[in-house]
Regions:
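N-terminal accessory regions of nucleic-acid-interacting proteins
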Residues: 2, 17, 24-84, 88, ...
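Acidic, Ala/Val/Gly-enriched low-complexity intrinsically disordered segments
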Residues: 9-10
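Active-site-proximal helix-loop-helix substrate-binding element of RNase H-like nuclease domains
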Residues: 37-55, 106-113, 117-121, 126, ...
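Short, well-ordered loop/turn elements at secondary-structure boundaries
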Residues: 79-80, 95-96, 127-130
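Short, conserved beta-strand segments within well-ordered enzyme catalytic domains
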Residues: 83-89, 101, 109-112
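Structural signal for hydrophobic/aromatic residues that build the beta-strand cores
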Residues: 86-87, 100, 134, 178
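A short alpha/beta connector and helix-capping loop motif
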Residues: 93-107
Length: 189
């Protein structure tokens, strides 16, 4: 790996997973009905990092994940590691939120918002709580969160990885960032 910063690697892996259907989503997306089962999976990322992934549309699983996140993982982390990866995926017409993804070190929540009952006060409170989130190109996600959830994440609580790692292009794609920051092998995906 080109970067040894564990937090950078975790966020980069999260972003890679969130944008690369060939890696992960194609194996999960067959469950699109409102009765889809919650799935807990271990996913090997980059050959050496095992991720614990929860894929669900159930409020109790989201609540449990957030509780674990706050009480076990986030509180135990060093201050410079207290941020989460955040990404939204959209419906085919780009008008609605389909999936909300959160990642912290090796823990990933993939919450299928589109097939849920859309009543998750714990999740909305968590997103508003002042935790720092890292993402790539937050512009569209901020708009969707504002209009879909009435959530405004303060500017000081957002890290846009594109502005942290100034690469060759002003708005470098996530794929180019992963190749430059993690490993050139990702260029073939």
């Amino acid at each position: 790996m080109k970067s040894t910063n564990r937090s950078t690697v975790a966020i980069s892996l999260f972003l890679l997973l969130s944008r690369s259907p060939s890696l992960f989503f194609s194996s999960l997306l067959p469950f699109s009905s409102s009765t889809m089962p919650t799935r807990f999976q271990k996913v090997l990322a980059h050959g050496t990092t095992m991720l614990d992934v929860v894929y669900t549309n159930e409020s109790r699983e989201v609540s449990f994940f957030l509780e674990q996140l706050k009480e076990k993982w986030l509180d135990a982390a060093m201050d410079h590691e207290k941020f989460l990866g955040l990404d939204l995926e959209y419906t085919a017409d780009q008008r609605g939120v389909a999936v909300i993804q959160l990642c912290f070190t090796r823990h990933v929540l993939i919450f299928q918002w589109a097939s849920s009952d859309k009543h998750f006060p714990e999740l909305m409170d968590f997103l508003r709580s002042g935790i720092t989130f890292a993402t790539v190109d937050i512009r569209n996600d901020k708009l969707k969160m504002r209009y879909s959830f009435r959530i405004e994440i303060p500017t000081g609580c957002l890290i846009d990885i594109q502005t942290v790692f100034r690469l060759r292009h002003v708005r470098t794609s996530m794929a180019h960032m992963v190749v430059a920051l993690i490993d050139e092998e990702y260029g073939d995906m």
